[in-house]
Amino acid sequence: MKFLDEAKVYIRSGDGGNGCVAFRREKFIEFGGPSGGNGGRGGDVIVEVADGLNTLIDYRYQQHFKAPKGTNGMGSDRHGANGKAIVLKVPLGTQIIDEDRETLIHDFTTVGERFVLAEGGNGGFGNAHFKSSTNRAPRNANPGQPGEERWIWLRLKLIADAGLVGLPNAGKSTFLSKVSAAKPKIADYPFTTLHPQLGVVNAGDREFVLADIPGLIEGAHEGTGLGDRFLGHVERCRVLLHLVDATCEHAGKAYKTVRGELEAYAGTLAEKVEIVALNKIDAVSVEDLKKQRDRLKRAANKMPLLLSGITGKGVPEVLQTLAAVIGEAPVSDKAKGAGASAAQAVVPPVAQAKPWSP
């Protein structure tokens, strides 16, 4: 299934049905009086979180959604039927944003959660409604009220416990494929990963969801490369695992490049708990590894973990550290409502990972 995390949608709720002007016409009843019924209410537009969805791809092929209008009132005091509501299914973690792309309308954090995005118009009154002691035969009725219409943006922010960040080719996808059942595309060229990937990781008696996003390069916040739009998918993570390639020219500069993009991002990513790890240690000499480790230590102000995603060396220690920090890190306010359902509702339908072993 293709991945789509943003879609522009037009929605319109149903108009209310018109009221009816009618009079009783029965044998032996000379002055039957008014009998026009009220119009039905227009259908609502409702957005609902569906279990098992992990993309907004359905909204690439259909962008216009209109609820049916209410039925007009009829004679013999028959009221019109209400229009049927239409329900838009979205994944857990979806946000509804106004057309200006800045105003947040609603944020979904629970499976099954519903939000009425546009209410249908009220039905008009029939002439029976206007009958009074001074007006025994009213000949007026109200038209139905129009429904609401608007353009909105649906934006998906995946809910995971930990997020992988780093430059392109830092080994993030390889690491994810080794510790979970996820099968991201892996190759030796930059930007192999074009869309976020999720995997469920078992670390001893702990289980957590790990998100891999496309690599960041200098100037990503200005649109360079794939930009920083995918950072929204790790905005709700408790912990960031920052992988740095040991074979790069300068590990410290590589680390600072990514940190600069995190700080330039509008969210709170730069304030999140961060675990720094030096990857691909099997591909460098002992002397170069020590030099890169010292550079990274000075840049990050902490001792980095060492690992190799290919051989598995150091991976158990990284997973245990991740699991421990996840248990202690504060949960984002927006992610609290997701609870244990996040892994079920957001993770693509891949096999559950077995406890990792080298």
Swiss-Prot record:
Q: What is its EC number?
A: 3.6.5.-
Which domain of life does the protein's organism represent? Bacteria
Q: Which residues are noted in the entry as GTP-binding? A: 166-173, 191-195, 212-215, 279-282, 308-310
> Where does it mainly reside?
cytoplasm
Q: Where is the Obg domain?
A: 1-159
Where found, per UniProt?
A: Cytoplasm
> Matching PANTHER family, A to Z?
DEVELOPMENTALLY REGULATED GTP-BINDING PROTEIN-RELATED, MITOCHONDRIAL RIBOSOME-ASSOCIATED GTPASE 2
According to UniProt, the name of this protein is GTPase Obg
Please give the organism.
Nitrobacter hamburgensis (strain DSM 10229 / NCIMB 13809 / X14)
